[in-house]
Amino acid sequence: KFLDLPKYGCINVHASLLPKYRGAAPIQYAIIKGEKESGVTIMQMDIGMDTGAMLDKVVVPIEENTTMGELHYALREQGAALLLQVIDKIAAGTAVAEPQDNEQATYATLLDRSMEHIDWSKTAQEVHNLIRGFNPAPSTFTKLPNGKGLKIWGSKMTDKNSAAAAGTVIETGKHSFFVACGEGVLEITEVQPESKK
């Protein structure tokens, strides 16, 4: 009954376009899943997990190389502005609550540490999305032939193809290197050796 105590109820700012990506990690999952847009939803709170009726939304585009950190910042700015607008509507009695379509719901569950390890057998796009979605936190890594870890902070899609085994470095440049994936080749642009800053 706590949610019923405030005169105007309780509201929440959620970093996704509900009912998609209910849960704890909506920003990361939007990028990992290759979404082209995300956004912020202001909703009424109820006893469910991000299931309350929606009061307003704002859409934020996700570009090819947008990272989780960049999207987080954009959502924060847009969400703060939207929250003020919704509060004004609630105070004026003009806010309209739209129930969520539960059949369209997807979930952004807690991130698992095992997800940080790059599986090069996936497509270049999937690996690129993971790297972007985990930058700056919790980050992604791969194991070198000597057993040491290498954090991967930046990548770019390419139009290259290779018959080399997934995970093989097929080409090096002055400021990057290219890795064969299960499908396609990914350019790695920023790394951090294990135990190095």
PLM features: residue spans?
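A generic structural signal for well-ordered coil/turn residues at beta-strand boundaries
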Residues: K36-G39, D50-T51, D56, D112-S114, ...
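Acyl-group handling in specialized metabolite and lipid biosynthesis
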Residues: T109-S121
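Donor/substrate-binding cores of folate-linked one-carbon enzymes
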Residues: K1-Y107
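Residues at structural and domain junctions
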Residues: L17, G69, R113-S114, T189-E190
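A short linear-motif detector with a strong N-terminal bias
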Residues: K20-R22, K33-E35, I90, V96-P99, ...
